[in-house]
């Protein structure tokens, strides 16, 4: 459905050349919810704007539904964009228009009849859960309701693709969850292809089938969400995943933590479990086999793409040789172990 082939985007600030996108290649299958995640300035918003030619790539191809948008004339591009809906972080609703009239605007511009507009807008508002808000103005809506109006408007031309540029960033957690559920529901009911740009791995974890990670304008890693969470290959992917299960070191431990081993100190370790290792009784195994004690400070577990993953902070009590053997045992059983320091 969406093919991004060797796309580069260069901006100029005076004589300075800024490579916002560097040789990006992505293939997004029809009906997929595809996430692109990256930190601020990574190039992800530039990428999504290239998909509907709001930003024209410096070079490369952007193929949507079999058509290379980079080769279209202005009139051809205008027509092709009807197949691509888009929602933003800021809802861009017209304050002087009611909910109904905001959703109706693209249909009016397309020259649809009043009867067709009435029918289509009524269907869309019912679809997004705003059947009772036809005559309400944006000023009287919550943030989540405003985004629902924006989604209905984006769907008014029956697009095959929906682009979401940080669509939940301005919303509180509960509202974010409801909007993500709506997007997932629309994907299921309409078989619409959805491209989501976000800086939150929580968004990717909750609704995406596949994900690409971008850093410094480059594609760092891509794959099924379950594969990325289970076997992250890059430091950036690991960083985003860890942020979804943020286990902070307690302050009293920070004050006693040393970088190197000293007599009488014990290692503080962070364990990362993915896939089958989450259910394996490896902690009790190393305690028995290597005659060590484990003090668990904190732990958390979650799901992404049908795969369980978890983090644990623990202090290990035992002699150095036994502790090192236990750590090697964990690593050999596909548990990632990081020694954060030594507690005195």
Swiss-Prot record:
Catalysed conversion reaction: L-methionine(out) + ATP + H2O = L-methionine(in) + ADP + phosphate + H(+); D-methionine(out) + ATP + H2O = D-methionine(in) + ADP + phosphate + H(+)
Primary location group: membrane
Start and end residues of each ABC transporter domain: 2-241
EC number of this enzyme: 7.4.2.11
UniProt keyword annotations, A-Z: Amino-acid transport, ATP-binding, Cell inner membrane, Cell membrane, Membrane, Nucleotide-binding, Translocase, Transport
Signal peptide positions on this chain: none
InterPro entries from the UniProt entry: AAA+_ATPase, ABC_MetN_proteobac, ABC_transporter-like_ATP-bd, ABC_transporter-like_CS, ACT-like_dom_sf, MetN_ABC, MetN_ABC_transporter-like, NIL_domain
Annotated Pfam families: ABC_tran (PF00005), NIL (PF09383)
Binding, ATP: 38-45
Cellular component GO terms held in the UniProt record: Gram-negative-bacterium-type cell wall; plasma membrane
Coiled coil: none
Disulfide bonds: none
Keyword S-adenosyl-L-methionine attached: no
Membrane topology: Peripheral membrane protein
SUPFAM superfamilies xrefs: ACT-like (SSF55021), P-loop containing nucleoside triphosphate hydrolases (SSF52540)
Protein location: Cell inner membrane
GO molecular function: ABC-type D-methionine transporter activity; ATP binding; ATP hydrolysis activity
Physiological role: Part of the ABC transporter complex MetNIQ involved in methionine import. Responsible for energy coupling to the transport system.
Oligomer status and interactors: The complex is composed of two ATP-binding proteins (MetN), two transmembrane proteins (MetI) and a solute-binding protein (MetQ).
Recorded family membership: Belongs to the ABC transporter superfamily. Methionine importer (TC 3.A.1.24) family.
Descriptive protein name: Methionine import ATP-binding protein MetN
Native source organism of the sequence: Aliivibrio fischeri (strain ATCC 700601 / ES114) (Vibrio fischeri)
């Amino acid at each position: 459905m969406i093919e991004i082939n060797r796309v580069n985007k260069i901006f100029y600030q005076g004589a300075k050349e800024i490579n916002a996108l560097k040789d990006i290649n992505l293939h997004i299958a029809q009906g997929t919810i595809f996430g692109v995640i990256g930190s601020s300035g990574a190039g992800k918003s530039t990428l999504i704007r290239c998909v509907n030619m709001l930003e024209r790539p410096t070079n490369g191809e952007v193929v949507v539904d079999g058509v290379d948008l980079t080769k279209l004339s202005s009139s051809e591009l205008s027509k092709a964009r009807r197949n691509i809906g888009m929602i933003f972080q800021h809802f861009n609703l017209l304050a002087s228009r009611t909910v109904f009239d905001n959703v109706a605007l693209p249909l009016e511009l397309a020259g649809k009849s009043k009867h067709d507009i009435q029918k289509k807008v009524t269907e869309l508002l019912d679809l997004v859960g705003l059947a009772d808000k036809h005559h309400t103005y944006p000023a009287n809506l919550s943030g989540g309701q405003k985004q629902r109006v924006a989604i209905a408007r984006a769907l008014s031309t029956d697009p095959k693709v929906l682009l979401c540029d940080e669509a939940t960033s301005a919303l509180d957690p509960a509202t974010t969850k409801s909007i993500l559920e709506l997007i997932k529901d629309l994907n299921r009911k309409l078989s619409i292809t959805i491209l989501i740009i976000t800086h939150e791995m929580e968004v990717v974890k909750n609704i995406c089938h596949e994900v690409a990670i971008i850093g410094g304008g480059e594609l760092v890693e891509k794959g099924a969400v379950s594969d990325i969470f289970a076997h992250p290959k890059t430091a950036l992917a690991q960083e985003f995943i860890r942020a979804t299960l943020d286990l902070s070191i307690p302050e009293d431990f920070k004050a006693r933590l040393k970088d190197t081993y000293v007599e009488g100190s014990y290692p503080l370790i962070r364990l990362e479990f993915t896939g089958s290792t989450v259910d394996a009784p490896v902690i009790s195994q190393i305690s028995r086999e290597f005659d060590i004690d484990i003090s668990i400070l904190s732990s958390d577990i979650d799901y992404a793409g049908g795969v369980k993953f978890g983090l644990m902070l623990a202090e290990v009590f035992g002699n150095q040789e036994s502790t090192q053997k236990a750590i090697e045992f964990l690593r050999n059983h596909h548990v990632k172990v990081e020694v954060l320091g030594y507690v005195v």
